């Protein structure tokens, strides 16, 4: 009468061992899957972070290409981009306004508006995170105008609303380039010439929008235009009235920086807006 009870006990132990083995196997599989998933996420984050660093280098290379051809009519170049974890957008039709004023006694104040575009790479903060509100420049500076040598390009990193952006735009350069004489009545009057150089980015309608994958970002100088402003009728320039300087400010979308102050040494001044229209396309 006791033997069946012993057999039943062994059977219960056998079932218990089987259940334990199944539980251990399922647990091991689950842990393996979790570890694999975590490892994959880490790998994806590393790849996304690497792409961001490469995108910065590609933006710098593209800027070099663009500035190299900007003042050479019909010249063109390209730079290679590979984007999987973010996206590159070509943003057209943004306002660039140049304002020129003299000193308190000067007789001139002029403004010119141009349309331009810029290039934006964006990715999520899961791949790279600088902190909400972060902004810094790795090419140029926040200033929208310079009166000396240096890059026209302005490349910044900005983080907002869970995204990190690399933005490439182009500022303005201005300086006194020459002095010449004009005859006014019986007098010879010295006139300063101030050149204002502008790189205007043109983006074709068909290419506006988002780009992902492998592609060449191309740039081509479409034309060079000089727009002279020689002052009132007669074309001899604006009278300085003793104020030997001009102040030039540039508003590029929401960005406006303090004026570039150009020192002058003549009695009059003329301005030349020298515009390079550069097409950017994929």
Regions found by a protein language model. Name each.
Residues 15-27:
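N-terminal signal-anchor/signal peptide hydrophobic helix marking the start
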Residues 1-13:
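N-terminal leader/signal peptides at the extreme start of proteins
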Residues 71-89:
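Short, glycine/small-hydrophobic-rich surface segments
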Residues 86, 94-104:
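N-terminal beta-strand/beta-hairpin edge segment
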Residues 26, 30-59:
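Aliphatic-rich helix starts adjacent to a transmembrane/signal segment
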Residues 58-73:
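N-terminal alpha-helical signal peptides/signal-anchor transmembrane segments
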Residues 103-268, 279-282:
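Intrinsically disordered, low-complexity regions enriched in Pro/Ser/Thr/Gly and acidic residues
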